[in-house]
């Protein structure tokens, strides 16, 4: 019985991982669809589509899946029509939360997001109710093996980046929104494809959470991220290492 139970647990975890991977693929395909329709279907002349393809590489989406998504987005009929929507609100302990969505039904998505906030002790606010607490920036990440810290810093600053942070594992470059695509293209031509390249919301200050509040905030974020319409979730919290270890136990 123990072996059988262990097998069931392994299969349950694998099933959960497969479901999460499928949801992530669906989000990437939705972004490819919108970006392909927002300009030419050629990534060489469509910066947003290039960023979507970079996201697809980040999650190991097969190239033929990407190609089919682009073809479907720009073909006859073109399928679903998605609207870009941003929701803002407060979670437990006053944590500020930004939710970015692509939806074909605004009423459904708004109701789902509002329900998630309410269930976990938060409240959905008005547009711009919390975004003033964040900065919108471009983030480009390369593995440390792509080049030395000095080479990456020099190339990034020359290309117009705002900052570079290098560790033993990665180089992370931040840019303004306006310079993001240009900086990414320059660095990609020199160092190869980045591990990740996206626009991000970075908090100016963070809220430190105890174990109870951290658990509630993480549950809220999980529910939001598992929603098919939600593309990304950002929040201004910090969880101390000892609290994170206790939650993982």
Curated annotation (Swiss-Prot):
GO biological process: regulation of DNA-templated transcription
Compartments, as annotated in UniProt: Cytoplasm
Keywords associated with the record: Cytoplasm, DNA-binding, Transcription, Transcription regulation
InterPro entries: Integrase-like_N, TACO1_YebC-like_2nd/3rd_dom, TACO1_YebC_N, Transcrip_reg_TACO1-like, Transcrip_reg_TACO1-like_dom3, YebC-like
GO annotation, cellular component aspect: cytosol
Molecular-function annotations in GO: DNA binding
Pfam family, one: Transcrip_reg
HAMAP family attached to this UniProt entry: Transcrip_reg_TACO1
Record family assignment: Belongs to the TACO1 family.
Protein name: Probable transcriptional regulatory protein GbCGDNIH1_1097
